[in-house]
Amino acid sequence: MLFSSSSSSLNSEVSQVFSENISSRSTTLTESSTQSEIRQHFGNEDFSGELPKKLIQLKKLKNGGTTIKKAKEDLEYCYDSLRLYENPYVTSSVDKKCGYSIELYLDNKYKTLMFSDLQLNADYPLYYDSSLDNISTNVERERATPLQIKGKIRINIDREDQALLITSHSISLKCFTKEYACFVNSETSKNSYSDKIIKELNHTEFFESSTYPKQQLRVIHHSLNDKKILLTKGTYDYPFTFTLQANTFPASFSSFFGKTHFRIESLTTIMRIPSKPKNLLKFLKNESFTDKIILTEEIKVKRVLPSTSMLKFETFQLRSYNTASEIVVSVIGNSKLIEIGMPFQMILSITKTDSSIELQEASLAVAQRMAIPSIDLKTKKILREPYIKKSEYLLRTVESQSFDSDKTIFGFCFDDVVIPTYADGLPSWFKTFYCEPSSFYPNHAALKVTHLLLFRITYSRNELVEGLEMKKNYRITVNFPILVGDSDISTSSLLPKYEKFENISDLQDEPPLYSMVAGENSL
């Protein structure tokens, strides 16, 4: 990689010995390379053949939580990336005493990656139920356009009497995950909560999965086996590029049943050179002058619907009734896709054939089903029925005063039903659709979040019970599976904004004169 620097105050002979030009580095992650990384990191539980690992907290490091002083080259430093309080994102390290700074630069456009590869399976869409099995290869993901992350590491040395020796320098894209499962004692009753334990799944007993990356992609600018690079006063840029193919990384997610999290991590190992070292060879062997600088930035990965998906424009209609067909409920929805913060339309029709029936209330809610694998506590095998956490969020109610007892047909049109944004009060437990493969159980999902629209109609009628007339309450529930996403879910299907021409002169068949173009450029 080529880099520029200002004039050096050190001996030119020393500079020639330790300086070299390094070409620009980039790397591409494919499905095969991802699996290779998984085998590399979790192939042996005791991590034989790898460096011993030391657990650290970034917030306790020097220079604003970035620098390990007197770092050991025979140790690999790990931190729990999902504990943001202990390990916050820090993108710059400044050492005023030694006169240098290191910064991680990443444009905002690279901080969120959106793959248009959310394949829902046309025959039986994934969002229809909470089943975790038969998660097949996603063909749509394989066709999606690769995405890139571009950035640079800038090293700046301010002082004439100081210099740095770069012994190693790399940039990594790391994926950290937490997977959970419900361990069930199959010999006892299935309804006994005391025999169900939800635990985190780990690849190794020594470290939590969130401490060591599930997958990572690395660009190495300089390794320990290379010659050391001498940097004197000046500014040095190290650009990097990651190219990500679809179907390699899971999407970002955070809940009490599972997490997936990404970081860009810059790792630079330096040796601080004093202004007048008495013995250069002795100095180079002295590890007390070695520092390791860790810089990190958050990356989000999203899956959105491909441009070929028409789910947003698909309507649905369904009908339900009680056993005696005394109450008939019809529901029409304008879309099978509901975006958080965007209004949608629902039409409710209720018909009663028995005038003695009294309608009490109607409600519309969105139900969430969050499923994780169920594991037999003894055999450790995955069970067919997953553990499902059920929750509901009420959207709209119709009170009893809206039902005239003399009528037999009631119609309600909800034009502005909205699942609010988190800023407007949506609880944090509510999540959008999510389904990603498990690292532990092939062809099964690690976590699946699905949703239903629930219409509930409560009514009462008088009945004879042991010769006495009593009022009994009943309920009819109409539900329909929907896909809930955020504002980006249908980005790929949006058409360019229509701009109306003001007059016919806006439509020009002939190009402008060269003299006019030249005149504009000369201004």
Curated annotation (Swiss-Prot):
Pfam annotation, one family: Arrestin_N
Question: From the record, what ranges are coiled-coil?
Answer: none
Gene3D superfamilies of this UniProt entry?
A: 2.60.40.640
Asked whether the keyword Transferase is assigned, the reply is no
**Record keywords:** Meiosis, Sporulation
Gene inactivation phenotype reads: Has a moderate sporulation defect.
Q: Which GO terms describe its biological process?
A: meiotic cell cycle; sporulation resulting in formation of a cellular spore
How is the subunit organization of this protein annotated in UniProt?
Interacts with SPO1 in meiosis.
Q: What does this protein do?
A: Regulates expression of PIS1.
Q: What is this protein called?
A: Sporulation protein 23
The UniProt gene name for this protein comes to SPO23
